Amino acid sequence: MNGGVQTWTQPRLCYLVKEGGSHGFSLKTVQGKKGVYMTDITPQGVAMRAGVLADDHLIEVNGENVEDASHEEVVEKVKKSGSRVMFLLVDKETDKRHVEQKIQFKRETASLKLLPHQPRIVEMKKGSNGYGFYLRAGSEQKGWGRVGQIIKDIDSGSPAEEAGLKNNDLVVAVNGESVETLDHDSVVEMIRKGGDQTSLLVVDKETDNMYRLAHFSPFLYYQSQELPNGSVKEAPAPTPTSLEVSSPPDTTEEEDHKPKLCRLAKGENGYGFHLNAIRGLPGSFIKEVQKGGPADLAGLEDEDVIIEVNGVNVLDEPYEKVVDRIQSSGKNVTLLVCGKKAYDYFQAKKIPIVSSLADPLDTPPDSKEGIVVESKHDSHMAKERAHSTASHSSSNSEDTEM
């Protein structure tokens, strides 16, 4: 790129949109080395403009780890991707250092710098008529394909318009907290709690599609803002390429292995399930789902592994912490869970389990018309305490009635 040699200290995401039937690169294997590597980078071609370097080690294709895959398997995955493909790559020198020091790459530290579309942080101060926009449930918006809250009907000259908010923006975070799996009323409440000013992390449709292709949450953009550039030499800005409309890749295999988003409303006897864990092993899972109870109606099943509680990943959290998160949720809780077979599949494929892989939640009836985010709000906001739960433990397991 401009004759300079770039060196990165972290993995990086590169987004390629095919032009003229080509991505502008080839794949190779190296004798005596594990993995697949990039080669034959076409000068000023799609791959080069996206930030791909010769001899880059290919770590992921569209969010799926391919470090142990054969050359033929990787080629097939790229072909199946169609016109758009997302690579997680490591440059030659960084790869060499990590191999020598036996350091494993962490995908959450990946640089987002080269991606052509980025989330936006929108800071607003409330005007006399509020912020000047409507918030509507995303499952109504055809084409989004995921749960979330969409910006609509921005008033001309309003704080929202002046701050750069756009119609159809998807809200990812409110005041630094992820709202990707929260329901409509919860997001509205978070905005109102901000008082006379609020900060929204939003994505347009192109950006949302791109991050979902990588199986990355746009919320990681906050983290990327706090990390160093990750390059010894400043990388030139990538040339934006328009998003091509193409047939979706064949996802038959993944369709059989989906996580589930379940929104539970607490009943008189709690949520109607037990939370279980095996001592000494990570993870908490669902047991004893009561037929006809809130958990059953929401789609929870015995042996479901809990991935997220209200948008927070809890896979590595201690059992007691997960119990506390659910109990402190009040009358409603949103869980991202995975059946045992699906969980084992994602673990084997090294695919991170994120909410964007799940089918979106149904839109609550009272949120279909959207509500104006304005200055008026209830003065009595006290929440009822969660009722007491029964907890049991044995020598090798934990079990709490929820």
UniProtKB/Swiss-Prot annotation:
Keywords: Repeat
Stretches with biased composition (Low complexity): 388-402
GO molecular function: protein-membrane adaptor activity; signaling receptor binding
Matching SUPFAM superfamilies: PDZ domain-like
Gene Ontology CC, one term: apical plasma membrane
GO biological process: protein localization to plasma membrane
Bias kind Basic and acidic residues: ranges: 365-387
Residue span of region Disordered: 230-258, 362-402
Leader sequence residues: none
CDD domains, per the entry: PDZ_NHERF-like (cd06768)
Comp. bias intervals (Polar residues): 240-250
Domain PDZ, first and last residues per copy: 12-93, 121-206, 261-341
InterPro entries: NHER, PDZ, PDZ_sf
Family label: Belongs to the NHER family.
Entry protein name: Putative PDZ domain-containing protein PDZK1P1
Upper classification of the organism: Eukaryota, Metazoa, Chordata, Craniata, Vertebrata
